[in-house]
Amino acid sequence: MKFVIKLFPEIMIKSESVRKRFVKILTGNIRNILTKHDETIAVVRHWDYIEVRSKKEENRPHLIELLGRIPGIHHFLEVDEKPFTTIHDIFEQTLQDIGTSLENKTFCVRVRRKGKHTFNSLDVERYVGGGLNQHIPSAKVQLSKPDVTVRIDIENDNMMLIKARHVGIGGYPIGTQEDVLSLISGGFDSGVSSYMLIRRGSRVHYCFFNLGGAAHEIGVKQMAYHIWQRYSASHKVRFVAINFEGVVGEILEKVDNGQMGVVLKRMMVRAASRIAERFGIQAIVTGEALGQVSSQTLTNLRLIDEASESLVLRPLITHDKEQIIAMAKEIGTDDIAKSMPEFCGVISKNPTVKAIKAKIEQEERHFDFAVLESAVQNAQYLDIRQIAEQTEKEVVAVDTVAVLSAQDVILDIRSPEETDEKPLNMENVQLMPFYKLSSQFANLDQSKNYLLYCERGVMSKLQALYLKEQGFSNVKVFRQ
């Protein structure tokens, strides 16, 4: 099984030295991700493409899924590579491989060729196309907008029949740009802005300001872990959690109501700048969009930036909310965001849309900065992979079972896409995506025991912890 990886076009127009560096990094990223799932993987880089081979045909669907989420890949081709001797041999092998798929369809043949041959690309197109037309009575040649385009690449004595073309996410390979620190709240905006910087080639670390207790932190960890695992698992990243409840309390007590939103954001970027400086991170990322809420006017954003010692990036600055939600759906964070409370928005009842610097500074003089200093000093730092390990320690009170009793119901909490792709074929299974547990679990028959199931056990244990904290004792984790 072979895939041919085509590079993001902007990589190809770089200088030779930069392009080589980008391709080398992308090759390493592909290898890091795929070898975790298939030990037979071989990844080889060429001048303008990357070749991926596997000996395990059964891994094909999973490898396609993984390659489709690696930044730097524009598209990739599934190919069947074989040696050939003559132009007639090319036709016979093509007929054998795809003949049945052309029945009752229109088609054309497109060929690209490298090397020395007694024929050119057009000769092959005519010969193979004519042969297929003669041997498949129900098929018909149509050069303009055919049902099927038969694509063949020829290089020296080998032919590659392109069986399928898959679209990648594009962008630059992670590691080609410098690291950034994303301020993640678990909402639509911060998840999408994090993804946009990942796609642009930055390793994205996460900084979370906890305003809502353990349940809020669990939800944000789920989102950060989801984004990392899905789009940037080739790299280690940090998850930083800062308890901001004391800072919020200080603001509520000492800052004028209309200035609270801007002051809170200034405190956040101050703290994030300290974290970024500690790890040599060049910029912080926020999900702010111009005019979306009162604190996101140009005047207010400028005042917020002045509190930061780091560059502040806002990739969503011109995006509409509708566009942001659509992007969240594409990357799979929308359902998590829907279940996440928005704590920042309720801190100020009459927020200013055009804060005055002197007024803000006057209000901040009432603030005890020792509270902010304490919050930063007591920040918790995690390798994002430790979220799974931390879950093992935190959910010690949740039993893990493999055998069902009469009162047990398996609650499959995977996303609808996962359950459709890999259904759990067992008895007594109910589907309830993890993001609906908080609102719908109480509606279930509470005389039953519910065994939460997800593929890796991370999400099920995080949700078990949450439900236990909400007072539900009939929760366990199911592992096959």
From Swiss-Prot:
It catalyses: [ThiI sulfur-carrier protein]-S-sulfanyl-L-cysteine + a uridine in tRNA + 2 reduced [2Fe-2S]-[ferredoxin] + ATP + H(+) = [ThiI sulfur-carrier protein]-L-cysteine + a 4-thiouridine in tRNA + 2 oxidized [2Fe-2S]-[ferredoxin] + AMP + diphosphate; [ThiS sulfur-carrier protein]-C-terminal Gly-Gly-AMP + S-sulfanyl-L-cysteinyl-[cysteine desulfurase] + AH2 = [ThiS sulfur-carrier protein]-C-terminal-Gly-aminoethanethioate + L-cysteinyl-[cysteine desulfurase] + A + AMP + 2 H(+). HAMAP family: ThiI (MF_00021). NCBIfam families: ThiI_C_thiazole (TIGR04271), tRNA uracil 4-sulfurtransferase ThiI (TIGR00342). Belongs to the ThiI family. This is tRNA sulfurtransferase. Residues 404-479 form the Rhodanese domain. GO terms for cellular component: cytosol. Pfam families: Rhodanese, ThiI, ThiI_fer, THUMP. Disulfide bonds join C344-C454. The gene is thiI. Its EC number is 2.8.1.4. Keywords: ATP-binding, Cytoplasm, Disulfide bond, Nucleotide-binding, Redox-active center, RNA-binding, Thiamine biosynthesis, Transferase, tRNA-binding. One of its GO terms (biological process) is thiamine diphosphate biosynthetic process. One of its GO terms (molecular function) is CCA tRNA nucleotidyltransferase activity. Gene3D superfamilies: 3.30.2130.30, HUPs (3.40.50.620), Rhodanese-like domain (3.40.250.10). Pathway: Cofactor biosynthesis; thiamine diphosphate biosynthesis. It comes from Pasteurella multocida (strain Pm70). SUPFAM superfamilies: Adenine nucleotide alpha hydrolases-like, Rhodanese/Cell cycle control phosphatase, THUMP domain-like. SMART domains: THUMP. It comes from the Bacteria.
